[in-house]
C-alpha cells in the first residue's frame, strides 16, 4: 500500500488516543518488516506492536465517515492545503484521505522481507492485515492451499538451500544489506514435498523461538535436518550451502562491518 504520507496516515497508539480516532476508520497494517517476528502474523501479534506504540493502524475514512466523525476531520485537516495539493500520490486517489482504496486495499497471503541483513523471511498472514510498500505482498496462486502448507513453505525458505538461493538472486548494497526485488523474490528456490509438510509445520513454535533469539544457524540446521531425513537433500550439500551463505554474506559486508551469523 502506498499512502503518500506514512507518517501521517499510519498511526500509533498515542496519536489514536490523542485524537480519539474511532476504530471504524482504522485498518491494521504492517509498516515495517522489522515489526514482524516468527513465520506468522495475526491480530494477537499485531496488538503487541500497537501496545509498543509503534505505527500499526492505517487511517482511511470514506466520505461518510469523514463527515460523521469530528475527531477524524480535525486530524485529516491538520495537513495544510499546500501539503495536500502538492502530494502527487494524493491526487491519484478518488479521495486523497482514503489510502485504503482499490488495489492498495488487497490483503496479501504473506509478507516477504525487502531490505535485509541476513536472509529473507516469509511471514504468513493469518488475519486481515495489510502492509506498506516497504514490505513485499505475497499471494499464493493455489487459493486452496492449506494453512499448514503455507507455514511449511515459510519454514523451508529458512533452509541453507533457499537462503543461498536468495543471496545469489538478491542485490547487495554498499551498506551491506541484501535487497530482494519482486522478480528476485519469485526466483528464490524453495524445496517442498508432501512428505515434509507435517515435519516442517511441527517446527513452527521452535523456529519462532529461535528467530526471537536470532539463532539463524540453528534454524538452518533444524530445517536442513528435516530435508535430509526425508531424502530431499544430502547433508554434504547442506554443508556446502552453509559455507556459501557465510562467504557471500561476508563479502557483501566487506568494508562496512564484520559479518557475524
Language model regions located:
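Non-catalytic DNA-recognition/assembly elements of restriction-modification systems
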Residues: 1-5, 71, 194-261
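Polybasic, glycine- and aromatic-enriched phosphate-binding surface used to engage nucleic acids
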Residues: 1-202, 209
Amino acid at each position: 500500500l502506498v499512502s503518500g504520507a506514512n507518517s501521517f496516515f499510519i498511526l500509533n497508539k498515542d496519536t489514536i488516543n490523542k485524537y480519539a480516532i474511532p476504530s471504524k476508520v482504522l485498518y491494521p497494517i504492517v509498516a515495517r518488516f522489522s515489526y514482524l517476528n516468527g513465520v506468522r502474523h495475526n491480530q494477537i501479534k499485531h496488538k503487541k506492536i500497537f501496545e509498543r506504540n509503534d505505527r500499526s493502524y492505517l487511517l482511511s475514512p470514506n466520505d461518510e465517515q469523514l463527515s460523521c466523525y469530528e475527531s477524524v476531520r480535525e486530524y485529516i485537516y491538520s495537513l495544510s492545503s499546500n501539503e495536500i495539493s502538492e502530494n502527487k500520490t494524493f491526487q491519484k486517489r478518488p479521495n486523497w484521505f482514503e489510502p485504503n482504496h482499490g488495489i492498495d486495499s488487497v490483503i496479501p497471503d504473506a509478507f516477504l522481507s525487502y531490505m535485509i541483513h541476513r536472509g529473507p523471511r516469509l511471514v504468513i498472514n493469518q488475519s486481515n492485515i495489510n502492509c506498506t510498500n516497504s514490505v513485499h505482498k505475497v499471494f499464493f496462486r493455489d487459493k486452496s492451499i492449506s494453512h499448514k502448507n503455507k507455514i511449511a513453505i515459510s519454514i523451508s525458505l529458512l533452509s541453507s538451500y533457499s537462503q543461498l538461493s536468495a543471496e545469489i538472486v538478491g542485490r547487495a548494497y554498499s551498506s551491506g544489506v541484501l535487497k530482494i526485488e519482486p522478480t528476485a523474490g519469485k526466483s528464490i528456490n524453495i524445496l517442498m514435498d508432501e512428505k515434509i509438510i507435517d515435519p516442517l509445520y511441527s517446527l513452527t513454535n521452535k523456529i519462532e523461538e529461535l528467530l526471537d533469539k536470532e539463532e539463524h544457524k540453528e534454524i538452518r540446521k533444524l530445517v536442513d535436518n528435516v530435508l535430509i531425513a526425508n531424502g530431499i537433500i544430502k547433508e554434504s550439500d547442506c554443508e556446502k550451502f552453509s559455507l556459501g551463505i557465510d562467504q557471500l554474506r561476508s563479502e557483501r559486508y566487506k568494508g562496512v562491518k564484520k559479518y557475524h551469523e
